[in-house]
Amino acid sequence: MRPSQKQITPEQLAFAQAHALVRIVDDQADLREALSFVLDMEGWKTISYGRAEDFFTGDSPSEPGCVVLDVRMPGMSGIEAQHEMRSRGIALPIIFLTGHGDVDMAVGAVQDGAFDFLLKPVDNERFLNLSLIHISE
């Protein structure tokens, strides 16, 4: 069964929403706010960071959930943040965001453990489905 076809029970959804945190790491404030709004309206807990460095200093990776991570940001890139997460033993699922359809980069990120890749502008329904799937795993 493909991840997009995974069935989630209402009980699994309620448990995930009560215990999981979606971390949004993107340098675009308007996108962070929009993604947080979409998730908040569906009952998810979110926290946003404008830089990967802020994520590493401000987050508690022991709290379950996932990371929505922009590929290209000033300072530490999303790909560099993925490698840093791995070196620190942070095993949260990653959904990458990019405004650039770089297939080689996407393949490399998935091979390094990313769970999915979304192109900007983000399709809200696909974003919600991917978040639910990866948080519930």
What annotation goes with each model-predicted range?
Residues M73:
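Receiver (REC) domain active-site loop signature in two-component systems and cognate sites
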Residues S62-V68:
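Active-site beta3 strand of CheY-like receiver
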Residues I133-E137:
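Conserved small/polar residues in nucleotide/adenosyl-binding loops
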Residues M1-R23, A29, S36:
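Non-catalytic signal-transmission and effector/linker regions of two-component phosphorelay proteins
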Residues G50-R51, M76-E80:
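Acidic catalytic/metal-coordinating carboxylates
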Residues D102-D104, L118-S131:
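C-terminal output helix
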Residues Q28-I47:
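Two-component/phosphorelay signaling modules centered on CheY-like receiver
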